[in-house]
């Protein structure tokens, strides 16, 4: 399975490495130094398991099918799934989530790949994914919340207390895609 991941923070990088054990994963970021570090096998974030996985990948002890890139089109064009793990800043004074990074990532995916399933892992408000599916007339978007601790993100992905992937109850294709993603 070919999977692209938008964002290489705690959520994006941990899910990338988890999935790269059995899938071809390409992580996308907009920060050149992060992409370069990842491709050298160095973690740009503090997480013991992420550091260990990247190191073991470079030594061949634990080979991963993982690479990072700045080129969104290259990453997204042949992907079966694209995981969106971009930042969504919440302003408690305005009670507002800035979801523009999620929407921009989905736009970049759809510019080159209309068939990929988009899996939102970013923190978004309740009902956001359903509203996005309707407003964009795009039924290939599903949601999978993250339950990760900072600094323990990969460990938490490797040993999940639960796996949740949401899809509309009346959309059998989305349900099948969600079930498939949960098994990856």
Residue ranges, per PLM feature:
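NAD(P)+-binding Rossmann beta1-loop-alpha1 motif at the extreme N-terminus of oxidoreductases
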Residues: 1-44
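A structured beta-alpha segment of the ubiquitous adenosine-cofactor-binding alpha/beta core
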Residues: 49-79
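Short acidic/histidine-rich motifs immediately flanking catalytic phosphotransfer sites
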Residues: 77-81, 114-116
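Redox-cofactor binding/interface segments in oxidoreductases and associated redox assembly factors
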Residues: 82-84, 120, 165
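Short glycine-/small-residue-rich Rossmann-like dinucleotide-binding loops
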Residues: 86-88, 123, 169
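Rossmann-like NAD(P)(H) cofactor-binding subdomain of soluble oxidoreductases
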Residues: 90-153
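Internal alpha-helical scaffold of NAD(P)-dependent oxidoreductase catalytic cores
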Residues: 131-142, 149-184
């Amino acid at each position: 399975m070919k999977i692209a991941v938008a964002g290489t923070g705690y959520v994006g990088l941990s899910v990338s490495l988890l999935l790269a054990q059995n899938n071809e994963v390409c992580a996308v970021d907009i920060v050149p130094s992060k992409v370069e570090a990842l491709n050298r096998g160095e973690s740009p974030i503090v997480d013991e398991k992420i550091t260990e996985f990247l190191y073991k990948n470079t030594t061949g002890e634990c080979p991963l099918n993982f690479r990072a890139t700045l080129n969104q089109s290259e990453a997204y064009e042949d992907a079966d799934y694209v995981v969106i793990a971009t930042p969504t800043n919440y302003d408690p004074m305005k009670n507002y989530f800035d979801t523009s990074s999620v929407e921009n990532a989905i736009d970049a995916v759809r510019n080159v790949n209309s068939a990929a399933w988009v899996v939102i892992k970013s923190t978004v408000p309740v009902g956001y994914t359903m509203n996005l599916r309707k407003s964009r007339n795009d039924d290939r978007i599903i949601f999978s919340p993250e339950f990760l601790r900072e600094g323990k993100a990969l460990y938490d992905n490797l040993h999940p207390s639960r796996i949740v992937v949401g899809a509309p109850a009346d959309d059998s294709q989305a349900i099948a895609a969600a079930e498939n993603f949960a098994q990856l």
